Swiss-Prot record:
NCBIfam families: ectoine_EctA
Major enzyme class: transferase
Keyword entries, A-Z: Acyltransferase, Transferase
SUPFAM superfamilies cross-referenced by the UniProt entry: Acyl-CoA N-acyltransferases (Nat)
EC number of the protein: 2.3.1.178
Family: Belongs to the acetyltransferase family. EctA subfamily.
Full protein name: L-2,4-diaminobutyric acid acetyltransferase
Pfam families linked to this entry: Acetyltransf_1
Provenance organism: Shouchella clausii (strain KSM-K16) (Alkalihalobacillus clausii)
Amino acid sequence: MSGKNEIINEKEAVMVQTPVLTLTKPTVEDGAAMWQLAKSSSLDTNSSYKYIMMCEYFDDTCIVAKDGDEVVGFITAFIPPKQQDTLFIWQIGVAASQRGRGLGLDLINKLIEREACKDIRYVEATVTPSNKASQALFRKLARSHQTDCQVSSCFSEQLFPGDSHEQENTFRIGPLRS
């Protein structure tokens, strides 16, 4: 994500330079910050171990956005063993300070450009019906790649223990152009 000039006060037409974010592979040292970002948002918070483990074993298919040394966004993802042409996005987290700037889409696009994702033709994620932001993001991804976004039922709420988890629907974007 490159630095962009933004007008923050239209009356005075003041221009400011927004920070240049670094989009890169995560390291195990980033795992705790990813966990903290998930915990401070409305995301399902997995154990801190999950984030550290994803950084160690799935760094080729995960990405972090940093403002200096601070993690301000991340994606945890993997290539399912039975779907080698698909990148499954487990979680996307964006700090409140970065929301509405297109960082989620930038992270996905940077991720699918990687050598490890050269055979990826589809992006999949599961999204709850109430998560309108993620639904909009995946539809925007499809539009930006001029491809389809198919939505299908995946995990019903009955599969989750307790009664506090919504149904998860699969969003499948693709085929992506090679």
